Structures are given as structure tokens and as C-alpha cells.
Amino acid sequence: MGMGFNPIKALFTGIGTVCVGVGALLSILCIINQTQHNIAFQNIYFIQLNTTSIFSVANQTAVVNNTSNLLNELTGTLVDTLETYIDQGATDLIEQVEQEMKDVSELPDWYSIGLWNYCQGNSSDYTNPTYCSTPSPSYYFNPLTMLETSINNATGSQINITLPSEVDLGLKVLKGACYAMRAMYILGFIFFALTIVSIVISCLPFFGPLFLNVFSFFATIFTFIAAVIAVATYRIAISELEKNIEILNIPIVLGKKIYAYSFLSAAAGLAACILYFIGNLTSGYSPL
């Protein structure tokens, strides 16, 4: 078809460019996440820790049940009445102690973990944080550091939590994974941007199609790797934390938006690769 205008190629290239734009936009949302707090960046976090029950007594039910079982071995109206008062009294006392400990500690009700920082807030609003740490390129998810900081700020004291060697090693691995994930997200966005820039030379017979396909391919790969690292890292982190700090009763959940954005961004990049490739084939040559 020579160097003339090819409407079919233009159509595929145009749709592919829209996919690249979508991928780049979603990539930006993943990278910025908790560093901004307007409506576009709400609830974009990797995991959220719920600390509303951190002071609950883990064996509350066991204590009450053991008391009930002991009293059930006896008979009589007086014993039945006494059992009722003990059950209710134990529950009320525990709830009162939990609330007083919560009020004194001034710990937040939740923490959300982002790419550059963490945020915390109250149970009355799980969307808008009351505080976010300063975004930093050296930040990585360390739950014990977060708790230490919150407790020290609330009490004005200096508390240091000592970890077993295997847990400390796990945090170092987690640190490396967080850094790698951050690098993959940034590289993915850079290649999305390079893909958009290379559109201006896409009319060139060889280098134009080559750059479009190569840049969109690497944008897809890096974004997908970032998403996989994020899912694997934080699923393992949740499993280990729930196993090792079960006594603290801190439920942890994965975020939804950031993983959806990550995989959709990679899918958009993949769609762009395919569309660019098909468009180039209609010109009678392949960039590969």
C-alpha cells in the first residue's frame, strides 16, 4: 500500500492509542494512590488493617463459657440466677475495659497501606483518613513501625518492639518486594508515556511500528509484573501477620481498586499491542 494513508491501520492504531491512554491513566492512579486525597484517589490501597478490636480479650468467650459449664454442673434456681449475672457481668466488664483502653491509647481504628506511605483514620469514616505519613521513596510496609509510631505519639513514650530473627528476615524480604513493585509500576508508566510519544513517528515504515509495539509491550509487562508482585506480597504478608499477631485481633483485607486498576492497565496495554500489530500487518509489513 506504499506510504499513502491507510484507513484500516489508522483505525487500529487509534483504538490502540485509546487503550494506551487508559492504561497510562490507571497506571497513574496506582502510582499516586494515597499521596492525594481527592475523590479520584479514595480507597486506593494495597491492604487495610482494622484495629478497632486490638484491645479485645481473646479468651473472653472461653472465660464466660467455662464459667457457664461449671455452673451447669450444679442445680437450683439460685445457681441459674447467679450464672446469668456472672455471664452478663463478665461481658459488660470486658467491654468497658476494652473501651477505656481504646480511649486512653488514642490508636486509630484503621491503617491503609499505599505505595509511598500509609494512612490512618476512624471507624466512623473508612474513606477519608485523619492522618497520612509523608510520602517517601524509601517507604515500605512495616506494621510494627506503624504501631510503634502511633503508640509513641499517643503516650509520649518511646516503645520499641523486638522481633524474632525469622520475622525480621521476613520484613527485609517484604521491603525488597515493595521496592521492586514500586519500580515496576514506574517503569510501566514510563513505557506507556513512551508509547504515546512514539505515535508521532508511527508513520515511519519501520521504526514507527517497532517503537509502538516494543514500548506498549514493555508497558504491559512491567505493569503486570507489578500487579503480580503486589498480590503475592500482600497475600503472604496477610497470612503471616494473621498467624503471628492473632492475639492482637487485627483483621486485614486486600484493597480492591488498586489491584483492579493494575490488571486493567496491563490488559489495556496488551490490547494496544495486539491492535498495533494487526494495524501494522494491514500495511504489508510487521515490526517483528
Curated annotation (Swiss-Prot):
GO terms for biological process: fungal-type cell wall organization. It comes from Schizosaccharomyces pombe (strain 972 / ATCC 24843) (Fission yeast). Residues 1-11, 207-210, 279-288 are cytoplasmic. This is SUR7 family protein pun1. It is found in: Golgi apparatus membrane; Cell membrane; Cell tip. Belongs to the SUR7 family. It holds the Pfam family SUR7. Its main location: Golgi. The gene is pun1. One of its GO terms (cellular component) is cell division site. Glycans are attached at N33, N50, N59, N66, N122, N153, N160. It comes from the Eukaryota. Keywords: Cell membrane, Glycoprotein, Golgi apparatus, Membrane, Transmembrane, Transmembrane helix. It is a multi-pass membrane protein. Contributes to the wild-type cellular response to nitrogen stress through signaling pathways that regulate the expression of genes involved in amino acid biosynthesis. Required for wild-type filamentous growth, cell growth, and cell-cell adhesion. Gene3D superfamilies: 1.20.140.150. The chain crosses the membrane at residues 12-32, 186-206, 211-231, 258-278. Residues 33-185, 232-257 are extracellular.
